[in-house]
Amino acid sequence: MSNHKTPSIRFKEFTDDWEQRKLTDFVSFFSGLTYTPSDIQENGTLVLRSSNVSDGEIIDADNVYVRSEVVNSENVQEGDIIVVVRNGSRSLIGKHAQIKHFMPNTVIGAFMTGIRSECPSFTNALLNTPHFDEEIAMNMGATINQITGYMFSKMEFRMPSLSEQKKIGSFFDNLDNLITLHQRKYEKLVNVKKSMLDKMFPKNGKKVPEIRFKGFTDDWEQRK
């Protein structure tokens, strides 16, 4: 843990030192669902697993649904952070994502842990810092790829006041929204480029492309 009591950059209205606190002092945890292969079906209750977490986002990937009558764990809530706590791949331990909107009929799997806090956007940003990665590395089991509740209880972080937490959380929420917006623009441009590459070059057997700049009408020549 660093001895610095304040960050190098902060909003100007805040001057108080950050306090060193245990993770369990400012978050609560909830467990995932244990199910059997016979509980799985084509639809029902969605069970979020490590495959549903990618780059800090919840994604549709290798979705698993179980019969609703076997569900004995609570539904995820908006703001919850779900964390991979056990996996065959050591590098996936600690991977996490925040639930950005209400997801009905959705729980987490047994190899996940849910985290709730008073300021989830700040907590999510905190878990994105290198310090959280360091805490995971220090507390992870030597032979089993997992983080237990006891290991979480040993983790410590510097924490600001709740008002500063909210300001920081809002700042990173806005950054995430901006990144998402530009990502969508990027994906659209990639699709435009792919389409233009297909239409601005002649297809097999054709001498002119489907789309070309006006002012050009000559056939394209076959050349080596």
Residue ranges and their predicted role:
Residues 3-7, 106-110, 141-166:
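A short glycine-rich beta-alpha junction/loop motif
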Residues 10, 139, 197, 204-212:
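Charged, alpha-helix-forming regions
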Residues 36-67:
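DNA target-recognition patches
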Residues 179-194, 202-205:
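Extended intrinsically disordered, low-complexity coil regions enriched in Ser, Thr, Gly, Ala
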Residues 7, 166-178, 182-185, 221-223:
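Extracellular/lumenal glycan-associated surfaces
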Residues 49-50, 61, 67-130:
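A short beta-sheet element
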Residues 10-32, 212-224:
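Non-catalytic DNA-recognition/assembly elements of restriction-modification systems
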